[in-house]
Amino acid sequence: MRNSDTLVIDLEKEYKVLSTAGCPKIYKDVRYIVFRRVPKDFEYVDLDGYCKDTAKSVGIDYEKSTIFLTAVDVREYGHATHIFRDVIAEVYVTFGVDKPSCIDANIPSNAMAVGTINVAVIVNKPLDEVGLLDLYRLVSEVKGLAMGLAGPMCLTAPSIGTASDATMVAAPQGGERFGGIATDVGFTAAVATLKALSKFVVGTNCIEYFVNSVGLRSIDDILKIAVKAYNKAPIPMLSSGEVEKILRREFEDVFKDPNICIVVRGARLAEMLMALNLFPGISEEEYRVDTPKIIADELIGKAIAEYVNGFKGLLAYYWIERLKEEGVFEELENLPPMTDDIVAAVVGSVLSRVYDKYLNSH
Protein backbone atom coordinates (compact mmCIF):
# COMPACT_ATOMS: atom_id res chain seq x y z
CA MET A 1 0.00 0.00 0.00
CA ARG A 2 1.29 3.46 -0.88
CA ASN A 3 -0.19 6.96 -1.02
CA SER A 4 1.02 10.43 -0.02
CA ASP A 5 0.33 9.74 3.66
CA THR A 6 1.08 6.06 4.19
CA LEU A 7 3.60 3.53 2.89
CA VAL A 8 3.19 -0.06 4.06
CA ILE A 9 5.91 -2.63 3.36
CA ASP A 10 4.99 -6.29 3.83
CA LEU A 11 8.11 -8.35 4.54
CA GLU A 12 6.01 -11.49 3.87
CA LYS A 13 7.43 -13.21 6.94
CA GLU A 14 8.45 -12.19 10.43
CA TYR A 15 11.87 -10.70 11.19
CA LYS A 16 13.50 -9.91 14.51
CA VAL A 17 13.60 -6.11 14.71
CA LEU A 18 15.44 -3.40 16.62
CA SER A 19 13.70 -0.09 15.94
CA THR A 20 13.60 3.46 17.34
CA ALA A 21 10.72 4.47 15.07
CA GLY A 22 7.85 6.62 16.34
CA CYS A 23 6.43 3.48 17.87
CA PRO A 24 9.61 1.48 18.60
CA LYS A 25 9.97 -2.26 18.66
CA ILE A 26 12.90 -3.68 20.62
CA TYR A 27 13.75 -7.27 19.69
CA LYS A 28 10.21 -7.98 18.55
CA ASP A 29 8.95 -10.11 15.68
CA VAL A 30 7.71 -7.79 12.92
CA ARG A 31 6.23 -8.35 9.48
CA TYR A 32 5.13 -4.84 8.47
CA ILE A 33 7.03 -1.57 8.17
CA VAL A 34 4.92 1.58 7.96
CA PHE A 35 5.94 5.13 7.06
CA ARG A 36 3.18 7.51 8.17
CA ARG A 37 2.97 11.17 7.19
CA VAL A 38 2.15 13.60 10.00
CA PRO A 39 1.99 17.43 10.18
CA LYS A 40 5.24 19.28 10.89
CA ASP A 41 3.76 20.55 14.14
CA PHE A 42 2.70 17.02 15.13
CA GLU A 43 2.32 16.63 18.87
CA TYR A 44 0.65 13.45 20.04
CA VAL A 45 0.92 12.48 23.67
CA ASP A 46 -0.32 8.92 23.25
CA LEU A 47 1.97 7.67 20.49
CA ASP A 48 1.09 4.03 21.11
CA GLY A 49 -2.57 4.85 20.65
CA TYR A 50 -1.84 6.79 17.47
CA CYS A 51 0.20 3.92 16.05
CA LYS A 52 -2.47 1.37 16.94
CA ASP A 53 -5.04 3.52 15.12
CA THR A 54 -2.67 3.81 12.14
CA ALA A 55 -2.18 0.04 11.96
CA LYS A 56 -5.91 -0.54 12.21
CA SER A 57 -6.62 2.00 9.44
CA VAL A 58 -4.43 0.08 6.98
CA GLY A 59 -5.57 -3.36 8.09
CA ILE A 60 -2.41 -4.73 9.70
CA ASP A 61 -1.52 -6.13 13.12
CA TYR A 62 -0.01 -3.43 15.32
CA GLU A 63 1.95 -5.99 17.33
CA LYS A 64 3.66 -7.14 14.13
CA SER A 65 4.40 -3.62 12.86
CA THR A 66 6.97 -0.88 13.35
CA ILE A 67 5.69 2.58 12.41
CA PHE A 68 7.87 5.51 11.33
CA LEU A 69 6.56 9.08 11.44
CA THR A 70 7.58 11.74 8.92
CA ALA A 71 6.37 15.12 7.63
CA VAL A 72 7.32 14.41 4.00
CA ASP A 73 5.30 12.86 1.19
CA VAL A 74 6.07 9.18 1.71
CA ARG A 75 5.80 8.53 -2.03
CA GLU A 76 9.18 10.28 -2.29
CA TYR A 77 10.99 7.58 -0.35
CA GLY A 78 14.43 6.27 -1.20
CA HIS A 79 14.96 2.57 -1.84
CA ALA A 80 18.04 0.50 -2.57
CA THR A 81 19.13 -3.13 -2.61
CA HIS A 82 22.67 -4.48 -2.49
CA ILE A 83 23.82 -8.08 -2.84
CA PHE A 84 27.24 -9.30 -1.72
CA ARG A 85 28.09 -12.98 -1.70
CA ASP A 86 25.07 -14.65 -0.08
CA VAL A 87 23.78 -11.54 1.72
CA ILE A 88 20.94 -9.34 0.49
CA ALA A 89 20.26 -5.97 2.12
CA GLU A 90 17.25 -3.81 1.31
CA VAL A 91 16.87 -0.25 2.59
CA TYR A 92 13.97 2.22 2.70
CA VAL A 93 14.52 5.89 3.58
CA THR A 94 12.36 8.97 4.07
CA PHE A 95 14.29 12.23 4.21
CA GLY A 96 12.86 15.38 5.76
CA VAL A 97 15.41 17.99 6.81
CA ASP A 98 14.26 21.59 7.15
CA LYS A 99 17.37 22.24 9.21
CA PRO A 100 19.84 19.71 10.58
CA SER A 101 20.77 19.34 14.22
CA CYS A 102 24.40 20.16 14.89
CA ILE A 103 27.30 19.35 17.18
CA ASP A 104 28.05 22.76 18.64
CA ALA A 105 27.76 23.71 22.30
CA ASN A 106 27.57 27.36 21.31
CA ILE A 107 24.24 26.95 19.48
CA PRO A 108 22.12 24.59 21.59
CA SER A 109 18.88 25.82 19.99
CA ASN A 110 19.83 24.00 16.78
CA ALA A 111 19.61 20.71 18.61
CA MET A 112 15.83 21.02 18.45
CA ALA A 113 15.63 21.87 14.74
CA VAL A 114 12.76 20.27 12.83
CA GLY A 115 13.43 17.24 10.65
CA THR A 116 13.40 13.47 10.48
CA ILE A 117 15.50 10.95 8.57
CA ASN A 118 13.99 7.46 8.76
CA VAL A 119 16.11 4.47 7.76
CA ALA A 120 14.79 0.90 7.61
CA VAL A 121 17.28 -1.88 6.80
CA ILE A 122 16.29 -5.49 6.13
CA VAL A 123 18.87 -8.25 5.69
CA ASN A 124 18.48 -11.96 4.96
CA LYS A 125 21.38 -12.98 7.22
CA PRO A 126 20.15 -14.49 10.53
CA LEU A 127 21.45 -12.55 13.56
CA ASP A 128 21.10 -12.87 17.30
CA GLU A 129 20.26 -9.87 19.49
CA VAL A 130 23.90 -8.77 19.81
CA GLY A 131 24.41 -9.07 16.06
CA LEU A 132 21.28 -7.02 15.43
CA LEU A 133 22.55 -4.34 17.82
CA ASP A 134 25.92 -4.35 16.05
CA LEU A 135 24.18 -3.86 12.71
CA TYR A 136 22.09 -1.03 14.18
CA ARG A 137 25.28 0.69 15.31
CA LEU A 138 26.78 0.40 11.84
CA VAL A 139 23.70 1.75 10.06
CA SER A 140 23.64 4.73 12.43
CA GLU A 141 27.32 5.38 11.68
CA VAL A 142 26.71 5.23 7.93
CA LYS A 143 23.77 7.61 8.14
CA GLY A 144 25.85 10.04 10.20
CA LEU A 145 28.73 9.75 7.73
CA ALA A 146 26.45 10.49 4.77
CA MET A 147 24.90 13.49 6.49
CA GLY A 148 28.24 14.88 7.61
CA LEU A 149 29.85 14.55 4.18
CA ALA A 150 26.96 15.44 1.89
CA GLY A 151 23.92 16.62 3.84
CA PRO A 152 22.85 20.12 4.88
CA MET A 153 25.29 21.87 7.20
CA CYS A 154 24.71 24.23 10.07
CA LEU A 155 26.40 27.62 10.06
CA THR A 156 29.22 26.82 12.46
CA ALA A 157 29.18 23.05 12.85
CA PRO A 158 28.59 19.80 10.98
CA SER A 159 25.50 17.66 11.29
CA ILE A 160 25.03 13.93 11.72
CA GLY A 161 21.26 14.03 11.32
CA THR A 162 18.23 15.63 12.93
CA ALA A 163 16.72 15.65 16.41
CA SER A 164 14.08 13.03 15.66
CA ASP A 165 15.83 10.57 13.34
CA ALA A 166 14.73 6.94 13.56
CA THR A 167 16.41 3.72 12.48
CA MET A 168 15.28 0.11 12.17
CA VAL A 169 17.25 -3.03 11.41
CA ALA A 170 15.57 -6.36 10.72
CA ALA A 171 16.98 -9.85 10.28
CA PRO A 172 15.84 -13.44 10.68
CA GLN A 173 16.45 -14.82 14.16
CA GLY A 174 19.77 -16.67 14.25
CA GLY A 175 23.06 -17.21 16.04
CA GLU A 176 25.40 -14.73 14.32
CA ARG A 177 26.48 -12.07 16.82
CA PHE A 178 28.50 -9.74 14.57
CA GLY A 179 27.07 -7.18 12.14
CA GLY A 180 29.84 -4.59 11.79
CA ILE A 181 31.53 -3.28 8.65
CA ALA A 182 34.04 -6.17 8.55
CA THR A 183 31.22 -8.72 8.13
CA ASP A 184 29.44 -9.56 4.90
CA VAL A 185 26.09 -8.52 6.36
CA GLY A 186 27.47 -5.23 7.68
CA PHE A 187 29.24 -4.33 4.44
CA THR A 188 26.14 -5.14 2.38
CA ALA A 189 23.84 -3.13 4.64
CA ALA A 190 26.25 -0.17 4.64
CA VAL A 191 26.42 -0.02 0.84
CA ALA A 192 22.64 -0.32 0.50
CA THR A 193 22.11 2.43 3.09
CA LEU A 194 24.44 4.80 1.22
CA LYS A 195 22.67 4.03 -2.05
CA ALA A 196 19.26 4.82 -0.56
CA LEU A 197 20.46 8.06 1.06
CA SER A 198 22.28 9.22 -2.07
CA LYS A 199 18.97 9.85 -3.86
CA PHE A 200 18.35 12.84 -1.64
CA VAL A 201 21.78 14.34 -2.31
CA VAL A 202 22.19 13.82 -6.05
CA GLY A 203 18.64 15.09 -6.58
CA THR A 204 19.54 18.48 -5.07
CA ASN A 205 20.18 21.34 -7.50
CA CYS A 206 23.47 23.20 -7.15
CA ILE A 207 21.91 26.37 -5.71
CA GLU A 208 20.23 24.42 -2.94
CA TYR A 209 23.42 22.41 -2.41
CA PHE A 210 25.48 25.61 -2.10
CA VAL A 211 23.03 27.16 0.37
CA ASN A 212 22.93 23.94 2.41
CA SER A 213 26.72 23.72 2.38
CA VAL A 214 27.30 27.21 3.77
CA GLY A 215 24.57 26.86 6.40
CA LEU A 216 22.21 29.54 5.06
CA ARG A 217 18.43 29.34 4.71
CA SER A 218 18.01 30.21 1.04
CA ILE A 219 19.57 32.04 -1.90
CA ASP A 220 17.72 35.13 -0.65
CA ASP A 221 20.30 35.44 2.15
CA ILE A 222 23.05 35.89 -0.46
CA LEU A 223 20.90 38.14 -2.65
CA LYS A 224 20.38 40.47 0.31
CA ILE A 225 24.15 40.91 0.67
CA ALA A 226 24.60 41.39 -3.09
CA VAL A 227 21.89 44.06 -3.33
CA LYS A 228 23.35 45.89 -0.33
CA ALA A 229 26.73 45.95 -2.08
CA TYR A 230 25.14 47.07 -5.36
CA ASN A 231 23.54 50.03 -3.59
CA LYS A 232 27.05 51.23 -2.76
CA ALA A 233 27.82 51.51 -6.48
CA PRO A 234 24.51 51.56 -8.37
CA ILE A 235 24.13 51.72 -12.13
CA PRO A 236 22.05 54.74 -13.20
CA MET A 237 18.47 53.83 -14.15
CA LEU A 238 18.83 50.30 -12.71
CA SER A 239 16.91 50.04 -9.44
CA SER A 240 17.59 47.68 -6.56
CA GLY A 241 14.46 45.72 -7.43
CA GLU A 242 15.55 45.29 -11.04
CA VAL A 243 19.10 44.32 -10.13
CA GLU A 244 17.84 41.74 -7.64
CA LYS A 245 16.06 39.91 -10.48
CA ILE A 246 19.19 40.12 -12.64
CA LEU A 247 21.37 38.89 -9.78
CA ARG A 248 19.08 35.95 -9.12
CA ARG A 249 19.45 34.85 -12.75
CA GLU A 250 23.23 35.29 -12.56
CA PHE A 251 23.47 33.23 -9.38
CA GLU A 252 21.37 30.51 -11.00
CA ASP A 253 23.68 30.54 -14.02
CA VAL A 254 26.87 30.42 -11.93
CA PHE A 255 25.57 27.59 -9.77
CA LYS A 256 24.86 25.43 -12.80
CA ASP A 257 28.60 24.77 -12.70
CA PRO A 258 29.26 21.91 -10.23
CA ASN A 259 32.89 23.03 -9.84
CA ILE A 260 31.74 25.90 -7.61
CA CYS A 261 29.91 23.50 -5.32
CA ILE A 262 32.86 21.10 -5.28
CA VAL A 263 35.23 23.83 -4.07
CA VAL A 264 32.74 25.23 -1.57
CA ARG A 265 31.89 21.85 -0.08
CA GLY A 266 35.54 20.95 0.30
CA ALA A 267 36.27 24.23 2.06
CA ARG A 268 33.32 23.83 4.39
CA LEU A 269 34.32 20.28 5.33
CA ALA A 270 37.77 21.57 6.26
CA GLU A 271 36.13 24.35 8.27
CA MET A 272 33.99 21.83 10.15
CA LEU A 273 37.09 19.84 11.09
CA MET A 274 38.73 22.96 12.51
CA ALA A 275 35.54 23.91 14.38
CA LEU A 276 35.59 20.49 16.09
CA ASN A 277 39.32 20.69 16.86
CA LEU A 278 40.01 17.77 14.52
CA PHE A 279 42.48 19.43 12.16
CA PRO A 280 46.21 18.90 12.84
CA GLY A 281 48.26 22.04 13.35
CA ILE A 282 45.26 24.35 13.88
CA SER A 283 43.60 24.62 17.29
CA GLU A 284 39.91 25.32 17.69
CA GLU A 285 40.73 28.65 19.33
CA GLU A 286 42.96 29.70 16.43
CA TYR A 287 40.16 28.87 14.03
CA ARG A 288 37.54 30.75 16.05
CA VAL A 289 39.60 33.97 16.16
CA ASP A 290 40.47 33.67 12.45
CA THR A 291 44.21 33.49 13.10
CA PRO A 292 46.48 35.05 10.45
CA LYS A 293 48.26 31.69 10.09
CA ILE A 294 45.19 30.43 8.19
CA ILE A 295 45.23 31.89 4.68
CA ALA A 296 43.30 29.07 3.03
CA ASP A 297 40.10 31.11 3.29
CA GLU A 298 41.59 33.90 1.19
CA LEU A 299 43.09 31.46 -1.30
CA ILE A 300 39.70 29.79 -1.75
CA GLY A 301 37.93 33.14 -2.08
CA LYS A 302 40.47 34.26 -4.67
CA ALA A 303 40.10 31.01 -6.63
CA ILE A 304 36.29 31.25 -6.69
CA ALA A 305 36.26 34.91 -7.71
CA GLU A 306 38.76 34.44 -10.54
CA TYR A 307 37.00 31.31 -11.75
CA VAL A 308 33.64 33.09 -11.98
CA ASN A 309 34.82 36.31 -13.66
CA GLY A 310 38.57 36.50 -13.95
CA PHE A 311 40.49 39.54 -12.71
CA LYS A 312 37.32 41.64 -12.51
CA GLY A 313 35.80 39.02 -10.24
CA LEU A 314 38.89 39.14 -8.04
CA LEU A 315 38.75 42.94 -7.75
CA ALA A 316 35.06 42.78 -6.86
CA TYR A 317 35.80 40.18 -4.18
CA TYR A 318 38.38 42.51 -2.64
CA TRP A 319 35.82 45.32 -2.81
CA ILE A 320 33.29 43.23 -0.87
CA GLU A 321 35.99 42.40 1.67
CA ARG A 322 36.73 46.11 2.15
CA LEU A 323 33.04 46.90 2.62
CA LYS A 324 32.88 44.08 5.15
CA GLU A 325 35.74 45.61 7.13
CA GLU A 326 33.85 48.93 7.10
CA GLY A 327 30.89 47.21 8.77
CA VAL A 328 28.53 47.34 5.79
CA PHE A 329 27.55 43.66 5.99
CA GLU A 330 26.49 42.48 9.41
CA GLU A 331 25.41 39.28 7.64
CA LEU A 332 29.04 38.47 6.78
CA GLU A 333 30.23 39.34 10.27
CA ASN A 334 28.12 36.49 11.64
CA LEU A 335 29.58 33.89 9.29
CA PRO A 336 32.46 31.55 10.21
CA PRO A 337 36.00 32.53 9.13
CA MET A 338 36.14 30.55 5.88
CA THR A 339 32.48 30.88 4.97
CA ASP A 340 32.54 34.68 4.95
CA ASP A 341 35.27 34.60 2.29
CA ILE A 342 33.32 32.06 0.24
CA VAL A 343 30.17 34.19 0.29
CA ALA A 344 32.12 37.42 -0.34
CA ALA A 345 33.85 35.85 -3.35
CA VAL A 346 30.60 34.56 -4.84
CA VAL A 347 28.78 37.84 -4.27
CA GLY A 348 31.61 40.00 -5.61
CA SER A 349 32.31 37.93 -8.71
CA VAL A 350 28.63 37.61 -9.64
CA LEU A 351 28.15 41.35 -9.14
CA SER A 352 31.11 42.01 -11.42
CA ARG A 353 29.42 39.95 -14.13
CA VAL A 354 26.30 42.09 -13.79
CA TYR A 355 28.32 45.30 -14.07
CA ASP A 356 30.13 43.88 -17.12
CA LYS A 357 26.99 42.84 -18.95
CA TYR A 358 24.96 45.95 -18.23
CA LEU A 359 27.67 48.57 -18.74
CA ASN A 360 29.02 46.90 -21.90
CA SER A 361 25.54 46.80 -23.43
CA HIS A 362 24.86 50.46 -22.69
Show where each model-derived region lies.
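Glycine-rich, aromatic-bearing surface loops/beta-hairpins
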Residues: L315-H362
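Aliphatic-rich, non-membrane protein domains
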Residues: K228-A229, E271-A275, S283, E325, ...
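Long, hydrophobic, amphipathic alpha-helical segments used as structural scaffolds
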Residues: M147-C154, V201-T204, Y230, P234, ...
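Extended, non-membrane alpha-helical segments enriched in charged/polar residues
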Residues: D220, K224, K228-K232, R249-K256, ...
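Long, charge-patterned amphipathic interaction tracts in eukaryotic proteins
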Residues: E244-Y318
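Mature-region segments of soluble proteins
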Residues: R2, T6-K13, V17-T20, T291-E330
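Alpha/propeptide regions of enzymes that mature by internal proteolysis
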Residues: M1-C206
